[in-house]
Amino acid sequence: MTKDEFLPHNCDLCGSADAAEIEAAKHYQNGQPLHVCKNCGLVYIKERRSANRIAEVWSEDIYEKGYTAKIPAVKARQTYVADFVDDALNIKGKSVCDIGGGEGQFLEIIREPTYGASVFAIEPSERNCQLMADNNIEAFCGSIEDYIDSGKTKNQKFDVVTIMWTIENCQSCRAMMEAAYDVLKDGGHVVISTGSRILVPFKKPLQYYLGPKATDTHPIRLSNNTITGLMAEGGFERTHINRFIDTEYLVAIGKKADRSKKIDWPKDDWSAIVEFFSRWHKETQDHYSDA
């Protein structure tokens, strides 16, 4: 495979190839298409590069060109997640692994005495791993796939795995969930945090949700139902969900279950998704096109 070869993908959640294009998205994505699965309602990008290539792009092109989590808006959402998870699970004394740990800011927050967690990160960016090392945060420098391949999961498992604003940025969300399952102790919990944007009141102009850069660096977009489905298909029973309808964030917690048993989950109506984006596009163009 060449470095930037894009390959077609079916729906990450249910595997269906039957999808409808969300026409409104092209206006914001430099003509790149966005699709919604007609079977389950997942919003996703069909054409993608390899998992390692996408991790490389995030490490070299995005983080190395000035992205930082050390701004008030990001710290606020990380603190929100810390409070929500601690209220639900009481993480004091528990081991927490953050997949896609970034600069380690969330782990800094939850290792403080207020929360008292024991922290670890898996992070592909060498720059970010060095930042965490300088701050005495233990990290595995590589992708989650690299971590699994290293064999470390045989002796190192965690009470809680957090995937914060990361699941939507990886090439395969299913592979990410399988990896989270593998690194958790029996009865452990996974936490997925992302933006609350789909089938909720519009939170921002659409150009600040969709953008012109390569769309496979953000190949899925989750709703309440599809985040629940992602957990169920990965072997997790959803136990907690935040009040996502009127906040910026969608935060779900799932408990590691028996993967051999089917877990039912609700689906979204794909036509409602298409109509939702059409309304969002109209609202943006009518009132916020120059915002």
Where are these regions (language model features)?
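Short glycine-/acidic-enriched loop or helix-start segments at secondary-structure transitions
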Residues: 107-108, 172-173, 201-203
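Short, glycine-/aromatic-enriched active-site segment of Class I SAM-dependent methyltransferases
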Residues: 193-220, 225-230
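A SAM-dependent methyltransferase catalytic signature shared across enzymes that methylate proteins
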Residues: 14-20, 224-242
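A short His-aromatic
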Residues: 165-169
